[in-house]
Amino acid sequence: VDTSEDTMGFDNIIALIKSQASPKAVAGMMKFGINTTNTYGVSIPALRAIAKKFRKRNHVIAQELWSSGIHEARLLASMIDDPNLVTEKQMEKWVNDFNSWDICDKCCSNLFDKTKYAYKKAIQWSTRNEEYVKRAGFVLSGGIGSS
């Protein structure tokens, strides 16, 4: 798989994720209560290495990655999306897509806490009933204070 930035389109990124699949890691993720539906078991350091190949953030590819529903693609989307282009609508869509604590926490700390809506969403979400939406509110609250 060619991994230069010029060829890091959606298909190549997904192929790269799949090439690093680790069934053993997936089994380990289950032990930590991570939802392993549509998961390949690629480590966070490996995903960060892919993200570093982008010299600047890429909102368009981030949207494609998120829409794939692949666990690691969603984590990567949170690493490469441009917080200046993230809308409240996108944040609401993504927070309602959260199906695991790690996606929630990483998306909030990689992306949402860098948006202009972070404070507003921290307040709104912390009063909601949905498990991962409420968690996102609390994760954002913690992130805002430390950034």
Predicted segments with their positions:
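Alpha-helical scaffold domains
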Residues: 2-147
